[in-house]
Amino acid sequence: MPKRRRIALIAHDHKKDDMIAFAQTHKAFLMRCDLLATGTTGGRLQDEVGLSVQRMLSGPWGGDLQIGAQLAEGRVDAVIFLRDPMTPQPHEPDINALVRACDVHNIPCATNLATADLVMIALGLAQPDPKEIHA
């Protein structure tokens, strides 16, 4: 039996509606995964999509860093981070640290919907684990 994928879902305020639509599109797959998300995004995913989500703090309060820590410990298989490139973020250093951690640990990190869709397809089809291919 394949292991359950562990996926982090994060969305900036102006991208939260996009995240909800994305999660609804991929709900069948996401329900077979262990999900973690920053606070507000996780709450909306639970309430509006009906997904079971481990909620971290909100991004500006350290949620991005909490996800980054789990990623560094090998407990995250992919990050879907719908960023708003048009709005400055007060916690930009935390965001950069999370994306850097994805690069350092060779974890897929989708920052737009097109890439997020491709990551979902790849995770659904991947045997073996994508991280093991380039180890």
Swiss-Prot record:
Transmembrane segments: none annotated. Its EC number is 4.2.3.3. The active site is at D64. Residues 1-135 form the MGS-like domain. GO terms for biological process: methylglyoxal biosynthetic process. GO terms for molecular function: methylglyoxal synthase activity. Keywords: Lyase. Substrate binds at H12, K16, T38, G39, T40, T41, S58, G59, H91. It catalyses: dihydroxyacetone phosphate = methylglyoxal + phosphate. The keyword Lyase applies. It comes from the Bacteria. One of its GO terms (cellular component) is cytosol. Gene3D superfamilies: Methylglyoxal synthase-like domain. HAMAP family: Methylglyoxal_synth. Belongs to the methylglyoxal synthase family. Catalyzes the formation of methylglyoxal from dihydroxyacetone phosphate. This is Methylglyoxal synthase. It comes from Ralstonia nicotianae (strain ATCC BAA-1114 / GMI1000) (Ralstonia solanacearum). The lineage of its organism: Bacteria, Pseudomonadati, Pseudomonadota, Betaproteobacteria, Burkholderiales.
